[in-house]
Amino acid sequence: MQHPASGESWLARPPRTAERRLRPWLTDPASLTARIRMRCGMFGVRVLRQSAGALTPDERRLLGLRAGERALLREVLLIADGRPVVFARSVLAQREQRGGWLRLWRGIGSRPLGAALFSDPRIRRQPLACARIGAADARYHLARRALAGAATLPPALWARRSVFRLHGRSLLVSEFFLPAILGLPDDPL
């Protein structure tokens, strides 16, 4: 699905042009947090932001929001052995800020969101989509700023996203893979 305003194309599966070692990261529907933890000695979450904010046009479209409709944003870096490996951005529309999502959102702190999402059997994940996100997308620049010079970004980042549903309400989670992700060991045998 092409979104002309941002230039990215979200796909159900990564194209052949995606680096082979990155494909499992883009397609595994299990917890990204758990996958990273299995491949590093020390794992951490650096919360960059957890507040109301503006959405990109494709985030609004995916969540069925009108321009100007408010949402809570959570932006974090996932850190493996001291190196940022993923920039993640979660979006919760203001109208969805009730019940289970609101309790989860308020109580998450610096814990990984993935651990909470995958531990609640009531939460259902919709299919993953992936895209190559470049400088035309505001989220690329958010990731670059979050790194604060700790790493140089390539011209584009591979990302994946999906919507999680709880009692008919939606939470969008997008994960942008930073170059250091390829420094983690391959899948254990």
From Swiss-Prot:
Pathway: Cofactor biosynthesis; ubiquinone biosynthesis
Entry-linked Pfam families: Chor_lyase
Gene3D superfamilies recorded: Chorismate lyase-like
Keyword Cytoplasm listed: yes
Enzyme Commission code(s) on record: 4.1.3.40
S-S pairs: none
GO CC entries: cytosol
Catalysis: reaction(s): chorismate = 4-hydroxybenzoate + pyruvate
Keywords in alphabetical order: Cytoplasm, Lyase, Pyruvate, Ubiquinone biosynthesis
Localization in the cell: Cytoplasm
A single MF term (Gene Ontology): chorismate lyase activity
UniProt-annotated binding residues for substrate: 74, 113, 175
Superkingdom as given in the UniProt entry: Bacteria
GO annotation, biological process: pyruvate biosynthetic process; ubiquinone biosynthetic process
Signal sequence region: none
SUPFAM superfamilies, sorted: Chorismate lyase-like (SSF64288)
Main location: cytoplasm
Protein family according to the UniProt entry: Belongs to the UbiC family.
Function: Removes the pyruvyl group from chorismate, with concomitant aromatization of the ring, to provide 4-hydroxybenzoate (4HB) for the ubiquinone pathway.
Protein name: Probable chorismate pyruvate-lyase
